[in-house]
Amino acid sequence: MAAAGRSALAIDFVGGAVGYKLRSGAARSHALLKATGMAPGRALQVIDATAGLGRDAFLLASMGASVTLIERSPQVHALLAQGLAAAQAESAELAGVVARMTLIQGDARDLLPTLQADVVTVDPMHPERTKTALVKQEMRLLRDLVGADPDVCELMQAALSARCGRVVLKWPLRAEPLAGVRKPSYQIAGKTVRYDVFVLPRGAAEERAPGADAALNP
């Protein structure tokens, strides 16, 4: 629950940062698209193993991907469902985006072995920064609600064992690699985060992404 005197956590796909990126066209240059291998005319099947606020999943769906969102927190799952319903009712365009999104409540470690996709994305709760004021309020509220992700290494191992062609880990730009997780095939850096891309045997024939390690929008 949010602490007294603080705004309650809400998920909004119509306004805010998500709406701005879609309206301005900024979404098309997002580093996540390059990390996942999104390209014009290429409709990917994506599993978002850590749905959270749902922004990355909505971005991918807005670019044409079919996205399965997995969220283990019942409270966050309910907020996501409300946000998606509001977006669906807002306009035909947003309803089309929502139609490409499937929301599941559960633990991705248990669900990933039962699913198949082109890409699995993992965006765990990031380590707390020393200067906590730099963390956006909504992320503080989310952390207060769901806590840390002490099992992120287990989740990554489940993702790397999934039936998919690549796994994309979203991680703070200058954070140390996750202990016990193999070295990524390559990295794509944003302003504050990086995308560690693991190309798996199913996707081994894919060429190294052009401009890997280049800075794009986070």
Swiss-Prot record:
Its main location: cytoplasm. It catalyses: guanosine(1516) in 16S rRNA + S-adenosyl-L-methionine = N(2)-methylguanosine(1516) in 16S rRNA + S-adenosyl-L-homocysteine + H(+). It comes from the Bacteria. GO terms for molecular function: rRNA (guanine-N2-)-methyltransferase activity. Pfam families: SAM_MT. It is found in: Cytoplasm. S-adenosyl-L-methionine binds at residues 55-56, 71-72, 123. One of its GO terms (cellular component) is cytoplasm. Keywords: Cytoplasm, Methyltransferase, rRNA processing, S-adenosyl-L-methionine, Transferase. SUPFAM superfamilies: S-adenosyl-L-methionine-dependent methyltransferases (SSF53335). It is an enzyme of class 2 (transferase). The keyword Glycoprotein does not apply. Its EC number is 2.1.1.242. InterPro entries: 16SrRNA_methylTrfase_J, SAM-dependent_MTases_sf. HAMAP family: 16SrRNA_methyltr_J. Belongs to the methyltransferase superfamily. RsmJ family. Specifically methylates the guanosine in position 1516 of 16S rRNA. This is Ribosomal RNA small subunit methyltransferase J. It comes from Rhodopseudomonas palustris (strain HaA2).
